Amino acid sequence: GVVVPTKLAYETMESLKEFYGQGIDTTDIVKSELVYSSKLTVDNAFGAEQVDAIALAIKQIKVGKGFIVGDMPGIGKGRICAGIMRYAKQQGKIPVFISAMATLFSDIYRDIENIGMLESGGKFPVPFILNDGENASIQRGTGEDSKTIFRPLTTKKTVQLCVDNTTGELPKGY
């Protein structure tokens, strides 16, 4: 398990009490809202802390508030983000992933795959990568077995797609 930092423990427990005090299991919330077939599928996709975080985030989103995921490295922030992206897709929204590190595009895509988002919801849209940095592509695998599956758009193509898009929708195919 993960130890909740002392300064966040009280607030975290109070937020979770709202669910558990009403006899609501966060796994049931995630199963329902992310449209998983069973609790076992949820448990295979996420760790317990991630399930709690996703349930709390959904609660905040439903009342028009934000949610910050700020755990230590290796706790699964990307997996939580992938879960929220799945929720967004279920709500008919377009998920947006912004990162200061271009290498995280591959990480978030791996998390999207690992939570079954590509299987259950059909095809995930082609990522609209605006970063033209050297590492901004999406890779599957590591090292010599690595294969590029998505590349960023060229700057000219990106500008053209954005300028031509006046409807508020992403360009066709994205």
Residue map of PLM features:
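A generic structural signal for ordered alpha-helices
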Residues: 31-35, 51, 66, 86
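Intrinsically disordered, low-structural-confidence terminal and linker regions
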Residues: 1-16
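Active-site signature of alpha/beta-hydrolase-fold catalytic machinery across serine-
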Residues: 55, 83-87
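N-terminal pre-P-loop "Q-motif" helix
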Residues: 43-65
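Walker A/P-loop
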Residues: 64-84
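SF2 helicase/translocase NTPase motor core
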Residues: 14-45, 78, 89-174
